[in-house]
Amino acid sequence: YNIGANVRNSLIASGCIINGDVENSIIFKKAYIGNNCVIKNSIILNDVYIGDNTVIENCIVESRDTIRANTKHIGEPGEIKIIIEKNERYVL
């Protein structure tokens, strides 16, 4: 974790770089989470890059995906939002 990172109630795999806030989430190997990001109630799979100032809540981010900076991806209660290479779909 870098200075300013805040991780609560989460599992973080080896090789990750965390610069933002992570809460109630699972982060797989070699994920990069940019500055001022907020990750809540989500699963971030292997080799994911999340740009600065991004919010991800109630989502699963597919392996080797890149999430652009300054974006928001928020799933609705009772749904899981899956993010795959800039396409989004909903699964109950």
What residue spans do the PLM features occupy?
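Left-handed beta-helix
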Residues: 1-92
